[in-house]
C-alpha cells in the first residue's frame, strides 16, 4: 500500500465515525496497520484511550498498564513536555514505550511520539513503538495525519459530552418548571426520603408526614416520569420503586433548596 492509499485509509476514520461514538481502539488499529507499529493513544492525564499491538511484548508490567488503561503519572507528565514529533527514541530515552527493565531484549526498540493537538490545546499523545526498523519519513507523515484525526475526534467527543450535559440540564429544568408549588414540595420530600438515586417510596407515609395529599405525590412523579427524568414502578402494597435517570435532577433540587 502506497503513502496516498494509507493516508486515505486514515482519513476514512473520520467519515466512518461521523454520527457514532468514538472508538479509539479501532482508530489505533488502523494506525497500527498502516504504520506497522504498536500504537497507543494517551490522554494528557495518562488515560489510555485506545491501543493496538503489532509486535507483542511479553512483559507483565506492560500488560497491567494495558489492562488498567492508564500509564504511570510521571511518564504521562513527561510526555506533555514533548511539543513536537520526536522520532526514533531508543530504549535509553525516558520516553521509550518499551519496558526499561528489559532494555537488553529491546535494544532495537524505537519509540516515536506525536503530540495530539486540537483547538490550540494539548489533548494527548500518539505513541508508536516498533522493533528493529526505524521510523522513516513516510511513517512520520502518517503518524502526524493520524494524530490530527485523533485530535479532531477527541474534540468532537468533548463537544458532544458538553451538548449532552446541557440537554440533560434543560430537560430537568423544564420538568421541575412544570410542577406546581405543592408538587415541587412533594418531590423535595420524596428524594430526601430516598437518600440516593433509587429506592422504595411509600407515598401515603410521606403524604401523612408532610401534610399533602397522595394525589399530589402521584402527579409529581407522573410529570417527572413523562419527562424521562425518573423511572417509577409500582410494587403494590410495598410502595413504589423510583430510580433517577437524569443525573442533573438531584443537583437542581438541591440548588432550589439553597436559593
UniProtKB/Swiss-Prot annotation:
A GO term (biological process) for this protein? negative regulation of DNA-templated transcription
Record's keyword terms, sorted:
Cytoplasm, DNA-binding, Repressor, Transcription, Transcription regulation
* Transmembrane annotation, as ranges: none
Instruction: Name the major location.
Output: cytoplasm
Q: Which family does it belong to?
A: Belongs to the CodY family.
The record's annotation in HAMAP family points to: HTH_type_CodY
Pfam families for the chain: CodY, HTH_CodY
According to the entry, DNA is bound by residues in 203-222
Which cellular component, as a GO term, is one annotated location?
cytoplasm
Q: Which PANTHER family match?
A: GLOBAL TRANSCRIPTIONAL REGULATOR CODY, GTP-SENSING TRANSCRIPTIONAL PLEIOTROPIC REPRESSOR CODY
Protein's UniProt keywords contain Phosphoprotein:
no
Subcellular locations according to the entry? Cytoplasm
- MF terms per GO, please? DNA binding; DNA-binding transcription factor activity; GTP binding
Q: Where is this region: GAF domain?
A: 1-155
InterPro entries, per database record: CodY (IPR014154), GAF-like_dom_sf (IPR029016), GTP_trans_reg_CodY_C (IPR013198), Transc_reg_CodY_N (IPR010312), WH-like_DNA-bd_sf (IPR036388), WH_DNA-bd_sf (IPR036390)
What's this protein's name?
Global transcriptional regulator CodY
Q: Which organism is it from?
A: Brevibacillus brevis (strain 47 / JCM 6285 / NBRC 100599)
Tell me the classification of the organism that encodes this protein: Bacteria, Bacillati, Bacillota, Bacilli, Bacillales
Q: What does this protein do?
A: DNA-binding global transcriptional regulator which is involved in the adaptive response to starvation and acts by directly or indirectly controlling the expression of numerous genes in response to nutrient availability. During rapid exponential growth, CodY is highly active and represses genes whose products allow adaptation to nutrient depletion.
Amino acid at each position: 500500500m502506497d503513502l496516498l492509499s494509507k493516508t486515505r485509509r486514515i482519513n476514512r476514520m473520520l467519515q466512518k465515525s461521523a454520527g457514532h461514538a468514538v472508538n479509539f481502539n479501532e482508530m489505533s488499529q488502523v494506525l497500527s496497520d498502516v504504520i506497522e507499529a504498536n500504537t497507543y493513544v494517551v490522554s494528557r492525564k495518562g488515560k489510555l484511550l485506545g491501543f493496538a499491538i503489532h509486535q507483542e511484548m511479553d512483559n507483565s508490567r506492560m500488560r497491567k498498564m494495558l489492562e488498567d488503561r492508564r500509564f504511570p503519572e510521571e511518564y504521562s507528565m513527561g510526555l506533555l513536555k514533548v511539543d513536537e514529533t520526536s522520532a526514533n527514541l531508543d530504549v535509553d530515552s525516558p520516553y521509550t514505550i518499551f519496558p526499561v527493565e528489559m532494555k537488553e531484549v529491546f535494544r532495537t526498540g524505537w519509540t516515536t511520539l506525536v503530540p495530539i493537538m486540537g483547538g490550540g490545546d494539548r489533548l494527548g499523545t500518539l505513541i508508536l513503538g516498533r522493533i528493529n526498523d526505524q521510523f522513516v519519513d513516510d511513517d512520520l507523515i502518517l503518524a502526524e495525519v493520524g494524530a490530527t484525526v485523533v485530535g479532531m475526534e477527541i474534540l468532537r467527543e468533548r463537544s458532544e459530552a458538553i451538548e449532552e450535559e446541557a440537554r440533560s440540564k434543560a430537560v430537568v429544568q423544564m420538568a421541575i418548571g412544570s410542577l406546581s408549588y405543592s408538587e415541587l414540595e412533594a418531590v423535595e420530600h420524596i428524594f430526601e426520603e430516598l437518600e440516593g438515586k433509587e429506592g422504595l417510596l411509600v407515598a401515603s407515609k410521606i403524604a401523612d408526614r408532610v401534610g399533602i395529599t397522595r394525589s399530589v405525590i402521584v402527579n409529581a412523579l407522573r410529570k417527572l416520569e413523562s419527562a424521562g427524568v425518573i423511572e417509577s414502578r409500582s410494587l403494590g402494597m410495598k410502595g413504589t420503586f423510583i430510580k433517577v435517570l437524569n443525573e442533573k435532577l438531584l443537583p437542581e433540587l438541591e440548588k432550589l433548596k439553597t436559593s
